[in-house]
Amino acid sequence: MKIYTCKDRLEDIMTCIYDAWADALLIGHDQIRLKKEPIFQATLLDEYIHVDGDSFKAEKVTRSIRRDISSRAYLYVYYASLSAEEDALQAIYNFLRVGFSMGAGVLENYTNPHVMRIIELYRSVGNESHHFREFARFQSLDGRVYVSHLEPKSDVIMLVGRHFADRMPSEYWMIVDDNRKTACIHPKDGENYLRYLTGGEFEALRKTEEYEDEYTGMWKTFFHTIGIKERENYVCQRNLFPIWKRKHAVEFKE
């Protein structure tokens, strides 16, 4: 068995699919597996092949999906590529095998387990993105830059950033993914872009949570005074706002 591995980036993922598919045409799809790095438990009898990103190959895969399946199918693949699930890359590969044979109607084939898995990943990533749109808390630095820290399981900060680009187009802000050390940066009246942070940049941005502006205290006061003591329900609250998502929410900080 050949196992193709790559970094958790869209270009690398698409390149990995390209190389694995080319090899599968020679030895068969059943002899190929795909996994995102890092690989925590390697097997002895399998051959591991690392794949680096190649923009030309990645673009060919993207173009083929949109042309031979549909743009909607590419959207599902894109969302699945953001998932933190261990089988996400293999699920994309399995879905494309079905998609290239069925065409545009593949997403209506609900009886196929590979199609259903890609739909599950799409919904999971979409839900997490929606939650963090609600849970993001921005803090002002000198009244010029707004910074929000998140720790999502899936790589959703660009999806979250798309929402705030529509709400705050004329502000300079950034959303930092503390797990992946990346940032979605929005220049004033500009387009969002993704930046991979250096160690120094990340440590500097981590300190931004130590600053409090005039609205931080006001929000904490509002949060604690608007509640009705007789109707407190911490079980329900944890269901709607899980503890692992609260780390950077100022209202839960002492």
Task: Label every PLM stretch briefly.
Residues 28-41, 173-181, 196-197:
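A generic structural motif
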Residues 1-54:
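N-terminal ordered "arm"
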Residues 172, 183-184, 188, 203-254:
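Long, compositionally biased intrinsically disordered terminal regions
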Residues 33-130:
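Charged, alpha-helical interface segments at or near domain boundaries
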Residues 75-80, 178, 231-238:
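Short coil/turn segments at secondary-structure boundaries
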Residues 12-23, 94-98, 162-166, 217-224:
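Short, hydrophobic/amphipathic alpha-helical patches that form generic packing surfaces
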Residues 48-53, 57, 190-204:
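Acidic, Ser/Thr-rich peripheral helices and adjacent loops at domain boundaries
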Residues 105-195:
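Internal, well-folded beta-alpha domain core
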